[in-house]
C-alpha cells in the first residue's frame, strides 16, 4: 500500500484551525503535566542510576517529538483508508504479540517478556496492538453491524479474536493489558448494539476467567493479598502500595509543592512510571489530584461529544474508533489511579499522557491523531453540506 502523504498532510496541518480547540488544549495540558511530573519524579533516580539528572526527561521529550511527527502522518491518512486496511492491522497485532514471545526477539523486563528490541529503542508489543485492535474492532463493528446484532456468528467471530489476543497477552504475561483490551472491546460491542444477553455473557465470562487466572497464579495472588492488607506485608509484597499511600498522606489537601516529594527519593519504586499519580498527589495534594481527574474527565467528555457527532452523521467506523479510544484511555487512567490509591490491585499500567514510557506516549499520540482526524473529517462534511 502506497499512500501519497504530502498533499493530505498539508491539508491536515491547514485544517488544524477546524479542530475542537478545547480537546486540543486539554491534550496539550495533559502532555505538559506529564513532562513536568516525569522531571519532578525522576531527577534524583536518574542522577543515581545513570549519572545524568535529565536522562528520563530527555528521553520522554524525544518520544514526544517522535509521537508528534508520527501523529502528523496518521492525521494525513483518511479514515476510509484505516477502515479498508484494518485487517492488515489485526495481522500486525497478532504478529507482534507472537514475536515478543520468541527468545532473542522479545526482551524480558521485570519477569515479563513484553518488549521488542528496535535498535536503541524498545517498544511494548501490547501498546502497538492496542492501536491496531481499536481500528480493527471499529471496522468490524461498522461492516458487520447487522450480523453482530442479529446472529451469533458475528458475535462469536469477534469473541474468538479477543480470546486469541488475551491468550497471547497472558503468555507474556500482561494481565493489565488483557483487562483493558477486553473491557474496551466489550464496551464497543455494547454501544454497537450487541444484544444485552450476549453482552452480559461476554462480561460475566470475561470477569470469571480473569478472576480465575488471578487466583491461580501465585504471583497475582500475592499481589491480591497485598492489596487487601498492604500493611501486613509492608516490607514485602505490600511495600510499593504502602509507600504510595504514604505519598497520598503526605500530600494532604494542598501538597508539599512541586519537586518537594520525599517518596520519590528511592522510597517508592516506579515513581516516574506506574506510580507517578502518587507523586503528583504528594506534591499537589488532594485538590491537585481532583483537578487532574477533572481534566481527564473533561477530555473524555469531549470524546463523547465527538462520538455522538460521528454517529449522528452516520460515520460509524469513526464513531467506534473515538469511542474505543475513549474507553481504553479511561480504563487505563482509572486503573492506574486506583492502583496508586489502594483502590485496585497492582496492574502495571501507565497513566496516559503522564507516566514516563516511550511506547505508551507514542501510541497515545497516534490515538489522538486518529481522534483529530475524525474531527477534521466531520467538520469538512459540515462545511461541504452548507448551502
Swiss-Prot record:
InterPro entries: FtsW, FtsW/RodA. Disulfide bonds: none annotated. It catalyses: [GlcNAc-(1->4)-Mur2Ac(oyl-L-Ala-gamma-D-Glu-L-Lys-D-Ala-D-Ala)](n)-di-trans,octa-cis-undecaprenyl diphosphate + beta-D-GlcNAc-(1->4)-Mur2Ac(oyl-L-Ala-gamma-D-Glu-L-Lys-D-Ala-D-Ala)-di-trans,octa-cis-undecaprenyl diphosphate = [GlcNAc-(1->4)-Mur2Ac(oyl-L-Ala-gamma-D-Glu-L-Lys-D-Ala-D-Ala)](n+1)-di-trans,octa-cis-undecaprenyl diphosphate + di-trans,octa-cis-undecaprenyl diphosphate + H(+). It is an enzyme of class 2 (transferase). Pathway: Cell wall biogenesis; peptidoglycan biosynthesis. The keyword Methyltransferase does not apply. One of its GO terms (biological process) is regulation of cell shape. It is a multi-pass membrane protein. It is found in: Cell inner membrane. The chain crosses the membrane at residues 19-39, 61-81, 86-106, 118-138, 161-181, 199-219, 286-306, 320-340, 352-372. Keywords: Cell cycle, Cell division, Cell inner membrane, Cell membrane, Cell shape, Cell wall biogenesis/degradation, Glycosyltransferase, Membrane, Peptidoglycan synthesis, Transferase, Transmembrane, Transmembrane helix. One of its GO terms (molecular function) is lipid-linked peptidoglycan transporter activity. GO terms for cellular component: cell division site; plasma membrane. Its EC number is 2.4.99.28. Pfam families: FTSW_RODA_SPOVE. PANTHER family: CELL CYCLE PROTEIN (PTHR30474), PEPTIDOGLYCAN GLYCOSYLTRANSFERASE FTSW-RELATED (PTHR30474:SF2). NCBIfam families: ftsW. Peptidoglycan polymerase that is essential for cell division. Belongs to the SEDS family. FtsW subfamily. This is Probable peptidoglycan glycosyltransferase FtsW. The lineage of its organism: Bacteria, Pseudomonadati, Pseudomonadota, Gammaproteobacteria, Cellvibrionales.
Amino acid at each position: 500500500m502506497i499512500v501519497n502523504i504530502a498533499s493530505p498532510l498539508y491539508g491536515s496541518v491547514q485544517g488544524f484551525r477546524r479542530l475542537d480547540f478545547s480537546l486540543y488544549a486539554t491534550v496539550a495540558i495533559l502532555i505538559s503535566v506529564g513532562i513536568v511530573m516525569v522531571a519532578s519524579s525522576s531527577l534524583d533516580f536518574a542522577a543515581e542510576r545513570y549519572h545524568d539528572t535529565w536522562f528520563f526527561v530527555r528521553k520522554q521529550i524525544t518520544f514526544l517529538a517522535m509521537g508528534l511527527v508520527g501523529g502528523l502522518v496518521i492525521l494525513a491518512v483518511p479514515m476510509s483508508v484505516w477502515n479498508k486496511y484494518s485487517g492488515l492491522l489485526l495481522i500486525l497485532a497478532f504478529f507482534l504479540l507472537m514475536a515478543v514471545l520468541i527468545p532473542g526477539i522479545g526482551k524480558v523486563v521485570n519477569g515479563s517478556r513484553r518488549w521488542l528490541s528496535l535498535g536503541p529503542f524498545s517498544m511494548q508489543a501490547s501498546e502497538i496492538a492496542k492501536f491496531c485492535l481499536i481500528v480493527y474492532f471499529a471496522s468490524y463493528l461498522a461492516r458487520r453491524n447487522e450480523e453482530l446484532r442479529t446472529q451469533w456468528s458475528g458475535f462469536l467471530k469477534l469473541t474468538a479474536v479477543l480470546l486469541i489476543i488475551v491468550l497471547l497477552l497472558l503468555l507474556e504475561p500482561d494481565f493489565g493489558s488483557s483487562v483493558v483490551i477486553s473491557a474496551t472491546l466489550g464496551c464497543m460491542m455494547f454501544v454497537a448494539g450487541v444484544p444485552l444477553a450476549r453482552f452480559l455473557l461476554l462480561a460475566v465470562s470475561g470477569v470469571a476467567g480473569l478472576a480465575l487466572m488471578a487466583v491461580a497464579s501465585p504471583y497475582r495472588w500475592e499481589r491480591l493479598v497485598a492489596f487487601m492488607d498492604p500493611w501486613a506485608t509492608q516490607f514485602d509484597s505490600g511495600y510499593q502500595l504502602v509507600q504510595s499511600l504514604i505519598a497520598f498522606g503526605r500530600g494532604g489537601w494542598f501538597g508539599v509543592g512541586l519537586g518537594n516529594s520525599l517518596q520519590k527519593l528511592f522510597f517508592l519504586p516506579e515513581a516516574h512510571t506506574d506510580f507517578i499519580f502518587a507523586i503528583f498527589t504528594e506534591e499537589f495534594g488532594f485538590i491537585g489530584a481532583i483537578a487532574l481527574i477533572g481534566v481527564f474527565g473533561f477530555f473524555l467528555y469531549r470524546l463523547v461529544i465527538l462520538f455522538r457527532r460521528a454517529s449522528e452523521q452516520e460515520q460509524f467506523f469513526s464513531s467506534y474508533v473515538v469511542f474505543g479510544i475513549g474507553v481504553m484511555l479511561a480504563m487505563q487512567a482509572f486503573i492506574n489511579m486506583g492502583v496508586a490509591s489502594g483502590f485496585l490491585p497492582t496492574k502495571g499500567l501507565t497513566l496516559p499522557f503522564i507516566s514516563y514510557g516511550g511506547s505508551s506516549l507514542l501510541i497515545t499520540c497516534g490515538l489522538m491523531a486518529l481522534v483529530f482526524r475524525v474531527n477534521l473529517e466531520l467538520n469538512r462534511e459540515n462545511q461541504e453540506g452548507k448551502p
